[in-house]
Amino acid sequence: MSDFAFKLYEYNVWANQQIFNRLKELPKEIYHQEIQSVFPSISHVLSHVYLSDLGWIEVFSGKTLSDALALAEQLKEQTEAKEIEEMEDLFLRLSERYILFLQQKEQLNKPLQIQNPSSGIMKTTVSELLPHVVNHGTYHRGNITAMLRQAGYASAPTDYGLYLFMTKTEKA
Amino acid sequence: MSDFAFKLYEYNVWANQQIFNRLKELPKEIYHQEIQSVFPSISHVLSHVYLSDLGWIEVFSGKTLSDALALAEQLKEQTEAKEIEEMEDLFLRLSERYILFLQQKEQLNKPLQIQNPSSGIMKTTVSELLPHVVNHGTYHRGNITAMLRQAGYASAPTDYGLYLFMTKTEKA
């Protein structure tokens, strides 16, 4: 299971980069443009994804969920204000941190107890939760694509099936 | 890996039902309402997800990818015209077919060779591709949430993390 969770995370990095590459092709103002949607703008969506991913690796590294949520809240405003290139860099450095962490195989199946403020304690592992980080990213990439279309622009392909074809067909 | 893929699919069924439950609370016309987004309406998004999922289980059951794509094309118009309750029923029956198929453990790791019209042959297994079915569903649930907000309505929570908390905390 852990190898699969690691591979899914690598897909997540590829999919985020597809979105950044596409956003950098568009007029600069699109990134902060107000759009009536799930979030006020695409920068708000990417900040939310970044701060969630940051929160989870803090939890994986021993922080409590409430401390991780507090950290995210503290960084929210400054993260939302960033420009697309700065955001791309933040995502890149965070993915490097994840990859370093996930390469320590013993981390993947280390038992975790997560105290959720609203629903008690969950006993889990990093490899069980990592698919949530990826699934959460996919969900918000789905938001971003709809928001881009709403603003009149196409998005970028980010399907896991496409990623599998690209990575596996080359090796075939 | 296969148990995890099965569990991820069960999450997908739960997440789809969350969306159907929410859509059924809203004014009936929302389902077919034209919205400038990734698809012309929410019914088009759910039809696309349904026909993709149908296509994949046909491939898992031995059909070629091009035959499965042809089947989806054939059913497209009639699927898009369905009302929300009919769509919910289609999804339910398809998920029962998936669960029956996935309970045959030997199916999960059966070698598959998939001829993609545009990028050659991929050697894979059902359990390796199943996460694509789920990830694809999550992506389009992300579209639907943005489309609902665009139309002025909140969506429903469908996070994998929430699903894990709900299913694991009860058993703790």
UniProtKB/Swiss-Prot annotation, chains A, B:
Output the SUPFAM superfamilies linked to this UniProt entry. DinB/YfiT-like putative metalloenzymes (SSF109854)
| Transmembrane helix is among the record's keywords | no
Q: From what superkingdom does this record's organism come?
A: Bacteria
Task: List UniProt keywords, sorted A-Z.
Answer: Metal-binding
UniProt binding sites for a divalent metal cation: H48, H136, H140
Q: Name one Pfam family in it.
A: DinB
Name the InterPro entries on file: DinB, DinB/YfiT-like
A molecular-function term among this protein's GO annotations: metal ion binding
Q: Which family does it belong to?
A: Belongs to the DinB family.
Subunit details: Homodimer.
Q: What is this protein called?
A: Protein DinB
Naturally occurring in which organism (per UniProt): Bacillus subtilis (strain 168)
Coding gene? dinB
